[in-house]
Structures are given as C-alpha cells and as structure tokens.
A protein has these predicted regions:
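ALDH superfamily catalytic-core signature
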Residues: 1-108, 133-135
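Conserved C-terminal structural/oligomerization subdomain of aldehyde/semialdehyde dehydrogenase
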Residues: 91-167
Length: 167
C-alpha cells in the first residue's frame, strides 16, 4: 500500500528494487501495489520515469493470459526479464523495461494479476481511501496465502493511527 502521506520516490524505488532483484523470483517481492487515488497519477508517473512499462488494456489482456496457464503460474515467466515476458505475450516494450505493470481492479482469484507472479510483473490497484486499500490488501493476502505479507509506505511521524490499524 502506498498511502498519500508516503514519500513517493522512496516507495517506488523500494518496490522497483524488490521486483528487479533476481527478476522478482523472491516470494517476498511485491506482487501488487495498492495506491490511494489522491496520489495514483504521481505514483504512476514515478514508476514510468524509472523504466517501468504500463500495459494498455489490450496488452494487459495478453500478459494476463501469459501469467496463468491452465490454472497455474506459467513457469516460462518465472525469473525472466520484463522484455522476455512481454515478448512471450506478444507485447512490444521499450528496451530496458524493468517491470510490466497491469492496472487492474479485481482482487479476486479470477484476476491473473492478483496471483503471485515470481517475475517483474506487477498489478497496480487504485484505492479510494485507506480503508479500501486495507480491504484490497487483506483480500489479496487471504487468496494468496497467509504465509505472505503486506507492507505500507506512509509518513510514520504523521500517520501512527493508520500504521496501528494496518498492523
């Protein structure tokens, strides 16, 4: 979750570092990012400025069909570079693309982007407020397995109540 009090540059940098280390094979890397509506565009711009590629609707559908095959994670995407995954999906991305980002709405298991992807592929959700963000995060964790975790980027000095509610 990226709260509207967060240092956007720090949050985005941390997520990119996590998703690009070992091409996202570490299960502790972010699988989804939930961003408060108020800062969504600024976060999106920061990701784009740092070499992440936002898939359009048609490209999102192509990558969606590449993430999960016959109900299971497609082994061909695990630990691969973003450009290779894009090519597998029939999507052309700029050279040096770090992460493929699909902007999606559903946190249900029927949404392929809601699954663990073990690759530099990220789901990005817009939350209307912090309660909506918490709800989405809880749903993603419940469906993904309680062995997984969630994190929050916020201004810890100003947002103690949100941090307490999150934890």
């Amino acid at each position: 979750i990226i709260d509207d009090s967060a240092d956007i540059t720090l949050a985005v940098n941390s997520i990119i570092h996590s998703k690009t280390f070992d091409n996202g094979m570490i299960c502790a890397s972010e699988q989804s990012v939930i961003v408060l509506e108020k800062i969504y565009d600024a976060v999106k711009e920061e990701f784009a400025n740092r070499g992440c590629y936002f898939l359009n609707e048609e490209e999102t559908e192509k990558v969606r069909k590449t993430i999960i095959i016959n109900g299971a994670l497609n082994a061909k995407i695990v630990g691969q570079k973003a450009a290779k995954i894009a090519a597998l999906a029939g999507v052309t991305v700029p050279e040096g693309t770090k992460i493929l980002i699909g902007e999606v709405e559903s946190v249900e298991l029927s949404e392929e982007f809601a699954h663990e992807k073990l690759s530099p592929v990220l789901a990005m959700y817009k939350a209307t407020d912090i309660e909506d963000a918490f709800s989405k995060a809880e749903h993603l964790i419940a469906d993904g397995g309680y062995g997984h975790t969630s994190s929050i980027y916020l201004d810890i000095a100003k947002e103690q109540d949100k941090l307490k509610e999150f934890s």
